[in-house]
Regions:
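N-terminal accessory nucleic-acid engagement/regulatory domains that precede
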Residues: 132-135, 140, 145, 150-486
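Extended, solvent-exposed polar beta/coil surface segments
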Residues: 1-251
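Conserved RecA-like ASCE P-loop NTPase motor core of nucleic-acid helicases/translocases
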Residues: 523-566, 620, 675-718, 728-735, ...
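Core RecA-like ATPase module of SF1/SF2 helicases and allied nucleic-acid translocases
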Residues: 531, 570-573, 656-659, 694-919
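N-terminal pre-P-loop "Q-motif" helix
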Residues: 500-521
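Conserved adenine-nucleotide phosphate-binding loops and their immediately adjacent elements
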Residues: 488-501
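Conserved, well-folded catalytic cores of nucleic-acid-processing
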Residues: 478-485, 543, 565-569, 611, ...
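ASCE P-loop NTPase helicase motor core
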Residues: 515-518, 522-681
Length: 919
């Protein structure tokens, strides 16, 4: 309905202008030195939700005077779900609910959020001018947005390409895509959108993400089909490919409807060509809403929408399913939170992971696995089976009202996994509730009976998770007891062994070897990158040559590195996960050697110690490198609870002889005050420019933190591939060229022969047909005919000594309508193009030349450990591409991770003696 223009101002518009005056008044205070930017940010955030809700009421009124009260706002917000042009308002409102109502931000957090929401204010300013001829936020430019100039230049050029008129095309034959991320950016006061997409198959990974740019915001919850044009921009004389999206439509996979229906015991076979399917997709595309939004409508609106969607359809397969879902959700039956979330995201892989063949009596008879029950009870504090929902998706699908106990627990869990802290101070969670004790009781009473270990408990002024404390206590107690007595005869035996061989390369290592098990049955070795930790492991292994040895590490690359470098007999190598999960593994061994200990979680370490029966332990790692993804601080903590003779530190690096580089590593490691000066003086820092694409060495790598974004791994790989002069072969969405460097992924097809992180180069590509392609790769591993006997691989004549040449095929994935053929291993390309790799993936690797890219977009995620890991990959040349502002922000936020605080509280609680450590 087209709104009639009115000559007078509506009361709701007057209210909007009142809010605008408050916001603009705060922006004016930016120029005052007496008012902190943090305070202004918090004030602006407080007004943002009011602004969005008032604009929603203005839209709902369609030019009519309507009362503004508590009842009107929810109706107005629901009205926004009827038209896709309001999508950005709904998204903004959802972000605000998540960040303001439930996570009261600290000063820095408020400012960061304001920067994030700046784009939405620009969208509001543009929208209200176009729709209602209202002039809002006229001094928004006073908020200082420090945009990276290089990134801004790219976006300006992309915006120019987005202004080009392109033909309308039939994109129905294009592949479906999942929308992974939608990022607004502003050029000349106009909003545009960067979107990260992945092919809509169950088996896609982060390596399959690619970026498109559009004038339109796209809803993120469902798969889409889109018109995508391949274009390029020119920067510093270099052409860089960009993908331009002009049109899209929601295109949920038919198998996702089938699998969702099966949760209710209803068997359907959705067809993409059916009137029913087309009607649903048209409605979802035009409205921008989700199927969850649909079932939450009033009876009257629901009936109208159902007629719109299914009016032209004779067969209505999914209508009964929606009716059942609506009935379950509106009556708040057991299982309703799961159905809410699944209906909101409709992701095939997630759906199938939750499903079972039998009815679950505790979940209203739905065919959902028992493991889904914790999520149904406390969705903000638990996960679905093999799926961790994003906070944004949770807030959009499930009402957080009355779930303060879950949000508090979520914060504590995040503090453990992100900051490696066993104890969370009570004062940090008081922002969720005024009565922490009562909310802890509510949480503990709601825990599923099989998850008693997740209970929250208090000690002093701290809160902790029971099983985390139990695991930590188990580790410290076991290692303490093993440190009380030495290995009888060790001192004499190791002395004789070293004298006979005369091959230990430094006095530092000789001294450590001499003392290693003299007084203890557990030895801990801390060492920086390149100090010879693996070298020392090899010597211990050779000394214990006739004894049974079990080598464990967290990742396959670390395991393979040990397998290659340990020259001893009686060895078993495996990942920690495999050791824990497998039955047929060695339990009784003479020595357990664990590498990369800083990456091992407390839960995994406790399980290993409970399973293995070993005489001695050697635990090796670097607390300054990347830590465990889940909570893991035992390796940093253990030195406070074992005698000083039981732990040692390797300090001399051997990876490089470059004195300036060695000094840089030390200054970063110890956080010296003159770190910035050293970086500048030795020209390690550079603004992001053309030189990032100019190779300094054949053995060179570019390191990025993330896969997405303009300077994410996937985009950098595409840019650098442009420099490869060989002809391109297109396969699906990706382009391959002879000469491209590659790294293998965690592909089930060739594990363990071709392991994750194995380096190689494409030396040949043969496209047999549109359905089949052959890759010929030179890999950094020597293989024989016997090695490949049980694999679908051809071994060709070698090109370079110490390497092998292999050949294998990849088949084209079938239509994404169905899921039966999705998991065929030979449809996945098992490697990624690797001109650039992630910092995490580079751990354990080394290169002559390393370039690290850090942009404003990801500066808050660069921790001290991540930065240290990145710069210590280099053997010779190092360049860090960042702006001076980003450099200052990253370095000023560095903190050395130290478990001393946790160790102090832990010692008081468990009465274990804590040892003083001299700096």
């Amino acid at each position: 309905v087209k709104e009639v223009k009115i000559a007078f101002m509506l009361k709701i518009e007057q209210r909007i202008y009142d809010i605008d005056r408050v916001i603009c008044g705060n922006l004016d205070m930016m120029e005052s030195s007496n008012v902190s930017r943090d305070l202004i940010s918090q004030n602006l955030l407080a007004q943002s939700r009011n602004l969005v809700e008032h604009i929603a009421v203005r839209a709902y009124g369609q030019g009519q005077e309507i009362p503004l009260n508590r009842e009107t706002v929810p109706i107005a917000m629901a009205y926004l779900k009827k038209n896709n042009k309001y999508l950005f308002l709904r998204k903004f409102h959802s972000f605000l609910q998540e960040s303001k109502s439930h996570y009261t931000p600290d000063n820095e957090g408020a400012e960061r959020l304001m920067l994030k929401y700046y784009q939405y204010f620009v969208m509001i300013k543009t929208f209200v001018k176009q729709e209602y001829d209202m002039n809002l936020l006229n001094n928004l430019n006073k908020f200082p947005i420090n945009t990276d100039k290089t990134v801004a230049e790219f976006y300006e050029k992309i915006a120019e390409r987005l202004k080009v008129n392109r033909p309308s095309i039939d994109y129905n034959r294009n592949e479906r895509m999942y929308v992974h991320k939608v990022i607004p950016f502003i050029v000349d006061g106009m909003p545009y959108f960067e979107m990260v997409l992945t092919p809509a198959f169950d088996s896609t990974s982060k390596f399959d993400r690619f970026i498109v740019y559009s004038k339109n915001m796209v809803p993120k919850h469902y798969a889409i089909k889109a018109a995508i044009f391949y274009d390029d921009i020119e920067v510093d004389g270099k052409k860089m490919p960009v993908n331009i999206m002009t049109e899209y439509s929601v295109s949920i996979r038919p198998c996702e409807f089938n699998n969702f229906a099966s949760l209710f015991g209803i068997k359907i076979k959705m067809q993409a060509a059916s009137a029913e399917y087309i009607g649903m997709m048209n409605y979802l595309t035009n409205s921008g809403s989700s199927l969850l939004d649909l079932v939450l409508l009033s009876d009257k609106d629901y009936a109208i929408c159902m007629r719109k969607m299914f009016g032209h359809s004779h067969a209505k397969h999914f209508e009964p399913v929606l009716n059942e879902a609506r009935k379950l959700i509106l009556s708040d039956q057991p299982g309703s939170n799961i159905i809410r979330y699944l209906l909101h995201i409709m992701n095939n892989k997630v759906l199938k992971l939750q499903r079972q063949n039998d009815n679950n009596k505790l979940l209203s008879g739905l065919r959902l696995k028992w493991g889904c029950i914790p999520f149904d009870k406390m969705p903000f504090a638990t996960s679905l089976i093999q799926h961790n929902p994003e906070a944004t998706e949770l807030f959009e699908s499930i009402d957080a009202e009355g779930r303060e106990h879950e949000l508090m627990a979520r914060y504590i869990q995040g503090n453990m996994s992100t900051n490696s802290r066993l104890y969370t101070p009570i004062k940090e969670v008081e922002k969720f509730t005024e009565n922490v004790d009562s909310q802890m009781d509510v949480f503990n009473d709601s825990i599923y009976y099989k998850h008693e270990g997740r209970r929250l408990a208090k000690f002093g002024q701290n809160i902790y998770v029971k099983e985390a404390l139990d695991n930590t206590h188990c580790i410290m107690d076991e290692l303490f007891h093993k440190s009380q007595n030495g290995l009888q005869g060790y001192a004499d035996a190791i002395t004789v062994w070293m004298e006979e061989r005369q091959n230990v390369d430094s006095d530092e290592k000789k001294e450590i070897l001499q003392k290693l098990f003299e007084k203890t049955h557990v030895a801990v070795i801390y060492g920086a990158a390149g100090t010879g930790k693996t070298y020392l492991i090899n010597h211990v292994s050779q000394f214990m040559d006739s004894h049974s040895k079990l080598f464990l590490a967290n990742t396959n690359p670390a395991v393979e590195n040990l397998r290659r470098k340990v020259m001893a007999q009686n060895c078993d190598f495996m990942t920690i996960r495999k050791y824990i999960m497998s039955k047929n593994v060695p339990v009784d061994v003479d020595i357990l050697i664990m590498d990369e200990c800083s990456m091992v979680s407390n839960a995994d370490m406790a399980e290993v110690l409970q399973k293995v029966n070993c005489k001695i332990l050697l635990l090796v790692g670097d607390t300054y490198q990347i830590e465990s993804i889940t909570f893991g601080n035992w390796f940093s903590m253990v030195k406070y609870f074992i005698p000083r003779y039981a732990w040692h530190e390797l300090k001399t690096p051997y990876r490089t002889k470059d004195e300036d580089l060695l000094t840089l590593w030390e200054k970063v490691r110890e956080l010296h005050e003159d770190l910035t000066e050293h970086i500048v003086a030795n020209r390690y820092a550079s603004n992001l420019d053309q030189s990032v694409f100019d190779k300094k060495s054949e053995d060179e790598i570019i390191l990025c933190l993330n896969y997405d974004g303009l300077y994410g791994i996937n985009n950098i790989n595409r840019f650098l591939q442009q420099n490869n002069p060989n002809s391109e072969i297109r396969w699906g969405l990706w382009t391959y060229k002879v000469g491209d460097p590659i790294l293998f992924n965690e592909s089930e097809r060739f594990i363990p022969l071709l392991y994750n992180n194995l380096k190689g180069t494409i030396v040949g590509i043969e496209k047999e047909s549109e359905e089949k392609i052959w890759f010929i790769l030179e890999i950094d591993k020597v293989l024989t005919e016997l090695d490949i006997m049980n694999y679908d691989i051809e071994l060709l004549d070698p090109i370079t000594p110490g390497k092998s040449v292999i050949k294998f095929y990849v088949l084209k994935k079938k239509n994404s309508d169905n899921d039966e053929t999705d998991f065929s291993g030979d449809t996945d390309v098992p490697f990624q193009i690797a001109y650039a790799v992630s910092i995490h993936k580079a751990q354990g690797l080394e290169y002559d030349s390393v370039k690290v890219i850090i942009t404003e977009e990801i500066d808050s995620m660069i921790t001290h450990n991540i930065f240290y890991t990145a710069i210590t990959r280099s053997k010779r040349d190092l360049t860090i591409y960042w702006s001076p502002e980003t450099q200052q922000k990253v370095i000023s936020n560095f903190q050395i991770a130290d478990a001393k605080g946790d160790a102090t509280v832990f010692a008081a609680q468990t009465h274990m003696k804590m040892r003083k450590i001299k700096n």
